[in-house]
Amino acid sequence: MVKAIRKLSLIQKIMIGIVIGTTLGFLVPEWTFISVLGELFVGALKAIAPILVFVLIIASLAQQKAGAKTYVGSILVVYLLATFLAAVVAVTASYLFPVKIVLEAAQEAQAAPTQLSDVLSNVLTSVVQNPIQAMIEGNYLSVLFWSSLIGIGLRQSSVATKDVIANLSTGITTVVQMIIGIAPIGILGLVFHSVATTGIAGLAKYGQLLLLLIGTMAVVALVVYPAIVFWNIRQNPYPLVFFVLKESAIPAFFTRSSAANIPINMELAKAMDLNEESYAVSIPLGATINMGGAAITITIMTLAAVHTLGMSVPIYLALLLSIIAAVSACGASGIAGGSLLLIPLACSLFGISNDIAMQVVGVGFIVGVVQDSIETALNSSSDLLFTTSVELADRRKNGEIIDVKALIGKSQLVVEQENI
């Protein structure tokens, strides 16, 4: 029995954990101790992720030779473009399928930013936070900033110093692999908690809104993002898209944390033999900047409020909303509460009062059980998707023959061997 389980791939083990967690959640919801398994798993990932990012970036930059090629600039452009396109799709979907919501008493929440300048100020200020405090709080903009400076500063250090840093990086990567190995048990606990505390009835009231959110994110994940990948690699993007959805989006869906999924994306990038000097920066950066799912949430929730209030929206204002949603979504990870607390900012564009906007936020918390999971899955998996596609595009331009299916097959073999 044990040997048979060990032969299963990590994703197969996770699916078994999902089934067991769902079953126990329905049958014995009072067994709350099972939820602790999920809390421990997510806590471990969140704890190790900032350290992993900090050390990996220092190690890669310290050993980087002058003039070495990286793809971070190109990946950043793709991140921003993808986030904007996601917002445009959300606006289009909201016009085609207008949804109204019941606005009841406003739910108490933390103060949300009321101006775009507040979001930008928050992001820029967070960059220069104390690096130790940044790792404790999971502030990846600051972690990226300081680790990059330290890594560049260590380029002139001795070979022995660089070897110590490289060995430390290897050791932390091994710890990450150990934590990822217990993902099936952790996800079992997460699924149990979700089913036991919420169930199906709690979400039925907001079915139309949920369907619009889920449908829009599905279109972006299966149509818009593959189109961007096709433009880069000039071949069928879906083998890569489905590989990333299976290996990265599923864990992200259940952890509901882009930060917790960074180590998983790092391991997958390593398995695909990507440029470490690029992905060590682009994947943590994507957890902060690549926020297509957040842009969709902000846009759809805002326009749902607009439709509920019977307001008419001219096309230029809808386009402006797309831009604001895309820009503010990039700061969602720097604000407690994520994308939901940026809804009042978007609502202010239409003159909607803060009281009503906070009611919309309250609805967001209710549907967030599903919405937040899918949003995180879309955001985090696309970090790996775009990082891979941009590097493959550069290889193609340099005359290298790109075989995506062979690359995926090789990486799947590496992932399965590491998790046996």
From Swiss-Prot:
- The answer, when asked if Transport is one of the entry's keywords, is yes
Please name the taxonomic classification of the source: Bacteria, Bacillati, Bacillota, Bacilli, Lactobacillales
A Gene Ontology molecular function term for this protein is: neutral L-amino acid:sodium symporter activity
By sequence similarity, the record places it as follows:
Belongs to the dicarboxylate/amino acid:cation symporter (DAACS) (TC 2.A.23) family.
The principal location of this protein is membrane
A Pfam family matched in the record: SDF
Presence of the UniProt keyword Cell inner membrane in the record: no
Q: Which GO terms describe its biological process?
A: serine transport; threonine transport
- HAMAP family found in the cross-reference section: Ser_Thr_transp_SstT
NCBIfam families xrefs: PRK13628.1
Residue ranges of the TM segments: 14-34, 40-60, 71-91, 172-192, 210-230, 283-303, 309-329, 332-352, 356-376
Q: Where is it localised?
A: Cell membrane
Topology in the membrane? Multi-pass membrane protein
PANTHER family from the UniProt entry:
PROTON/GLUTAMATE-ASPARTATE SYMPORTER, SERINE_THREONINE TRANSPORTER SSTT
- What does the UniProt keyword field contain? Amino-acid transport, Cell membrane, Membrane, Symport, Transmembrane, Transmembrane helix, Transport
Cellular component (GO) terms are: plasma membrane
General function of this protein: Involved in the import of serine and threonine into the cell, with the concomitant import of sodium (symport system).
The protein, known as: Serine/threonine transporter SstT
What InterPro entries does UniProt report for this protein, alphabetically? Answer: Na-dicarboxylate_symporter, Na:dicarbo_symporter_sf, Ser_Thr_transp_SstT
Report which reactions are catalysed by this protein.
Answer: L-serine(in) + Na(+)(in) = L-serine(out) + Na(+)(out); L-threonine(in) + Na(+)(in) = L-threonine(out) + Na(+)(out)
